[in-house]
């Protein structure tokens, strides 16, 4: 069971199945160094409702000329069946290295809905989406000299998504999307042994197919589209990455940064969408999502410094920042994390270790109200906060470890800016941000077999 603070339903039942098979063969010839393959299968069955773990909301019902308040108890089932496969070969000769391969992914998604108080709302289980993707990829590396290496790669995906909802078929909408999605990158890696320094710079391009929730859950797509399934385009991102890492004695430093241009960024706008009942009245009372594509600019950076004070005491200090702009509407890109800093101090012994984590997060004033992504949206500017956590672990025996910890030691009340209050994935969204957990004690045991 799982209670969702910012959603209209809780997870009352979960069932998961997973199977995996992997093989690897090394040193086949002087050139072919490795052939590897894997197949993974998973099945997830998730039942949500608004009455098992909470009191359902009341709704007005008209019966025989009388208006009554009835509990609006609802339950939904969501299932996903996934089969993934991958086959790759690694070759090396002289200064060259090459990884080539193919992969595939198959998804089937379905669900149902039931209402004990309003049987007319019942929808029997049926499959609503079929997804399949075939991809081919290659990565070529060339060792220019002892200090420099050039790496480049590309992949091509053929994606097919089928809309199997009865409503889409009845209205004559196009129910099949077929897209060919290219991706490529080039990266220059550099080593400076005299300065204990490694650096890199790279440029990449990727096209991303909208996922299930982006295609199926919003109430509409781009202006002029018949429905969301046919009204949202794949995202296209061109991004520059660069960074370095230096280890010099007890001191280590690192930094990385990125800047990118996104065409057809999938933006969700959360507002009221009328939903008419059988009597012609508006039956919707919640904010739901609409999707559209916009162009965006993104950038960000992360940097840190660490120091080994003694053989057992070490500490590191890091900071990270992200920025985004919706250039189509000349607004901040929503759901961007604020500036954050972390101080991590550790004491490491042979059989145990102790840790302290101090996290400081700045306020976020760059917001776009009621806009976001499929997970959540910007409700308002957020305040800054800081938290302190303690943890430790002890090695009981060779393959058994016990860990304990206290999160939010000072029991502060705070709210993350990326507050997952939106529930577009299930057709609802909340206007309320909820606080993160207060002081929290936890224990975990891990075993290896």
Question: Residue ranges of each PLM-predicted region?
Answer:
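Extracellular loop and loop/strand-boundary signature of outer-membrane beta-barrel proteins
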Residues: 3-11, 22-24, 68-77, 84-88, ...
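Conserved C-terminal beta-signal and adjacent last beta-strands/turns
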Residues: 12, 26, 140, 201, ...
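Face-selective signature of the C-terminal outer-membrane beta-barrel domain
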Residues: 14-168, 173-204, 246-247, 251-258, ...
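Short coil turns and loop connectors of transmembrane beta-barrels in diderm outer membranes
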Residues: 29-31, 94-95, 146-147, 193-196, ...
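Surface-exposed extracellular loop regions of Gram-negative outer-membrane beta-barrel proteins
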Residues: 45, 110-115, 158-169, 176, ...
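Outer membrane beta-barrel strand-and-loop segments of large Gram-negative receptors
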Residues: 68-89, 129-137, 227-233, 239, ...
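Gram-negative outer-membrane beta-barrel transporters
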Residues: 142-150, 158-159, 258-262, 271, ...
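Small/polar-residue-rich segments within soluble enzyme cores
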Residues: 243
């Amino acid at each position: 069971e799982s209670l969702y603070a910012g959603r209209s339903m809780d997870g009352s039942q979960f069932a998961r199945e997973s199977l995996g098979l992997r093989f690897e063969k090394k040193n086949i010839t002087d050139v072919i160094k490795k052939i590897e393959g894997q197949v993974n299968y998973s099945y997830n069955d998730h039942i949500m409702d608004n009455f098992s773990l909470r009191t359902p909301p009341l709704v007005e019902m008209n019966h025989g000329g009388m208006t009554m308040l009835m509990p609006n108890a609802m339950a939904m089932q969501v299932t996903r069946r996934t089969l993934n496969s991958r086959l790759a070969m690694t070759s090396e000769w002289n200064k060259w290295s090459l990884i080539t391969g193919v992969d595939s992914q198959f998804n089937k998604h379905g669900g149902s809905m039931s209402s004990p108080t309003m049987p007319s709302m019942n929808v029997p289980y049926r499959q609503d989406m079929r997804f399949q993707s075939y991809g081919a990829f290659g990565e070529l590396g060339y060792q220019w000299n002892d200090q420099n290496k050039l790496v480049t790669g590309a992949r091509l995906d053929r994606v097919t998504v089928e809309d199997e909802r009865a409503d889409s078929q009845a209205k004559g909408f196009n129910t099949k999307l077929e897209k060919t999605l290219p991706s490529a990158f080039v990266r220059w890696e550099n080593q400076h042994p005299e300065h204990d320094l490694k650096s890199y710079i790279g440029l990449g391009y990727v096209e991303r197919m909208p996922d299930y929730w982006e295609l199926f859950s919003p109430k509409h797509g781009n202006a002029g589209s018949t429905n969301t399934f046919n009204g949202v385009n794949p995202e296209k991102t061109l991004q520059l990455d660069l960074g370095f890492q230096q280890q010099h004695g007890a001191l280590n430093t690192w930094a990385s940064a990125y800047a990118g241009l996104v065409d057809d960024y999938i933006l969700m706008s959360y507002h009221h969408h009328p939903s008419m009942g059988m009597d012609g009245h508006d039956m919707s009372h919640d904010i739901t999502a609409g999707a559209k594509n916009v162009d965006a600019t993104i950038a960000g950076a992360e940097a840190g410094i660490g120091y080994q004070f003694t053989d057992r005491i070490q500490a590191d200090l890091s900071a990270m920042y992200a920025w985004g702009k919706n250039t189509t509407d000349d607004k901040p890109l929503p759901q961007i994390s604020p500036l954050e800093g972390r101080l991590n101090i550790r004491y490491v012994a042979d059989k145990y270790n102790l840790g302290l984590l101090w996290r400081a997060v700045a306020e976020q004033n760059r917001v776009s109200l009621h806009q976001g992504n499929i997970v959540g949206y910007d409700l308002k500017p957020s305040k800054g906060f800081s938290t302190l956590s303690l943890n430790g672990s002890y090695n009981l025996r060779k393959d058994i470890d016990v860990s304990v910890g206290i999160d939010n030691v000072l029991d502060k009340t705070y709210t993350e800016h990326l507050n997952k209050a939106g529930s577009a994935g299930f057709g609802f969204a909340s206007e309320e941000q909820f606080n993160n957990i207060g002081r929290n004690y936890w224990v975990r045991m891990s075993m290896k077999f």
